Amino acid sequence: MRALRFSAGSWRCVFAWMLLLVGLAAQGAELSELERLRIAQVFPAVERIGDPEGDYGVRRLSKGEETLGYAFQTLSVTDIPAYSGKPINLQVILDPQAVIRDAYVLEHHEPILLIGIPEEKLHAFSARYDGVRADQRVVVGRSSDPQAVTVDAVSGATVTVMVVNEIVMRAAHTVAVALGLIEDRGNVRPKPAQVRQQPAATASWSELLGNGAIRRLQLSRGQIDDAFKGSEAEGIGEADAAHRDEPFIDLYSALLNPPAVGRSLLGDNQYRELMASLKPGEYAFVVLGDGEYSFKGSGYVRGGIFDRVQLRQFGDIISFRDLDYQRLSDVYAEGMPEFREMAIFVARASQRFDPGSPWTLELLVRRQTGPVAGVFTSFELACQTPEEYLERPQPTAEELAALEEAARPLWLRVWYQKSFQVGVLCTALVLLLAILFLQDRLVRRPRLMQRLRTGYLAFTLVYLGWYSLGQLSVVNVLTFVHALFEGFRWELFLSDPLLFILWTFTAASLLLWGRGVFCGWLCPFGALQELLNELARKLRVPQFQVPFAVHERLWAIKYIILLVLFGLSLESLALAEQAAEVEPFKTAITLGFDRQWWFVAYAVALLVVNLFTRKVYCRYLCPLGAALAIPAKARLFDWLKRRAECGRPCQLCARECEIQAIHPDGRIEANECHYCLDCQMTYHDQDKCPPLVNKRKKRAKSAPADNARIPAENL
């Protein structure tokens, strides 16, 4: 029996240790080793990391009783979507002065960073927030606000780092406000307004009520009872059903400093005396009440402070003491009702009252729950000085520009920052439209057309691709499809202005002419292939044509790749983004071949093959081209002209088409055509197009003889 007792005690001990270990493991699961490491690096002396507290899961970092700082995850505070459509999660560490000590990326789904730009660059960017206060303004790039902190973007991931900036600063500010470390932005004081002192005509009571100079708060006994429901004072002194609508208090208040208000209510003599008693920066308020409840009470008699009325502005409470109170014996406004209580209260200069900003008069109602205990509830009367009584300081041009810039949403700030690139791109697209609409005239001048096209391809590669990073991707298509089913947000697609404009133009051109306009003119990687192949031809590199029967069947590969990527995206968009590396765009265009060797080898291999057979990748492997080809069947226009002889018997255009988009029977395959317009130059060339050459020869034979050119011996 003794042994049994020992065994039971041992099991209790083991069970207690198991509970302790489970608790520690649970805490460790909540706070990862990486988060602990970052905290230890910032605060090496930290002894305790508290549990998540409050709405934002903030952990208190302490050494003994001293608070060293606070740590939290941004995903608990804000979920702003990044370029991938999903939020980025960071751990942010604040010190007690609301200074950011660390911001570290814990999780992201950005495709350019998953496979592309090294993550170290993103961590290096987030490290720049060390030393920034939570109430400072941080701008990625340049800013017209001289007070703003500016940080450089990460090349190739501008949108991502702008979202990171928004996430870090918004989350840090929100948490710092919740912890009481800084003021709420909504409570930040503007430059105070001044009351106009010009003489003004007096107004009646109804006129002052009408323009908002006097504000009114009416409360019934039933409203008071309802306010105490759920508290310890519920049911104490409640009115029965017959008396719920009886008035509890009818309260009025106004700022007396404006002459039109003060003279109307107090009369000229009393108003002058009141203004003479006020020091600069002091403001007087009239409070008038009727009903069973006294807004003055009797507390000020015992303690010298009025405990039933107070003002609140910018989150600050303005309380009134007996020295701030003046008796008011009479009010002179025409049509004014009678009041049981009247008083004037003065806000002192040290309380920094601003007559130009909204404020509230709070009425506090107390119910006794014990000999000395009681419960308070408050009722607010919103007040605002009419604009005609105020003079506001004019902001400087720099302040206006800073305010305008700060008020812009994130996507609009990106557009402003890239306004030059947007302007150049829009100009280039207008030029492309002009080429398309004037194609019949331009193709009659082959040399001009070829130079124009070569120049446009060089612009697409160098400026649009390598400089502006305007390379569309099948990832954009997958993201768009998922957004349609998971909550479409325009901000996500507007966050990159160049891609948004390109996609808008591409979508319109698909409906009008098919995929060829984008693939042949606006794809930087396609332009790179075409320019390299042109150079290879000039260097007499041999060219190989795939037999058309084989070529036609190889078209299916890109559609299969597209279906595989779409299927993967249904399981995991991040997995599909990684599989989309079948596109060499990131390597060759976005990152300029600055990647791991295997990515570079893949892109270079495609370009080497392209030297011998033009645009092999575009023809057979490009999932983006496949996605654009699907809606091409619905195109509205077919401006590529053909003749009856095309394909039967003439095969010139089919042989010359460098991507083999013309069937042997002469039909142009719209799903494969890149709209290079070479066939149209041949179509209009009377010295090259066989049907035109034959017609010219026939006309020459049937033309009447010219006697002046017949030799004399033949006459």
Curated annotation (Swiss-Prot):
One annotated Gene Ontology cellular component of this protein: plasma membrane
Annotated SMART domains: FMN_bind
Known DNA-binding region: 210-229
Alphabetical keyword list: Activator, Cell membrane, DNA-binding, Membrane, Transcription, Transcription regulation
Superkingdom of the organism of origin: Bacteria
Pfam families in the cross-refs: Fer4_5, FMN_bind
Record's bilayer topology term: Peripheral membrane protein
SUPFAM superfamilies with a match to the protein in the record: 4Fe-4S ferredoxins
Any one GO biological process: positive regulation of DNA-templated transcription
Location of this chain's protein in the cell: Cell membrane
InterPro entries hit by this protein: 4Fe4S_Fe-S-bd (IPR017896), FMN-bd (IPR007329), NosR (IPR011399), NosR_regulator (IPR052378)
A GO MF label: DNA binding
Transmembrane segments: none
Function field: Transcriptional activator of the nitrous-oxide reductase gene NosZ.
Protein name from the UniProt record: Regulatory protein NosR
Species of origin: Pseudomonas aeruginosa (strain ATCC 15692 / DSM 22644 / CIP 104116 / JCM 14847 / LMG 12228 / 1C / PRS 101 / PAO1)
Lineage: Bacteria, Pseudomonadati, Pseudomonadota, Gammaproteobacteria, Pseudomonadales
Gene that encodes the chain: nosR
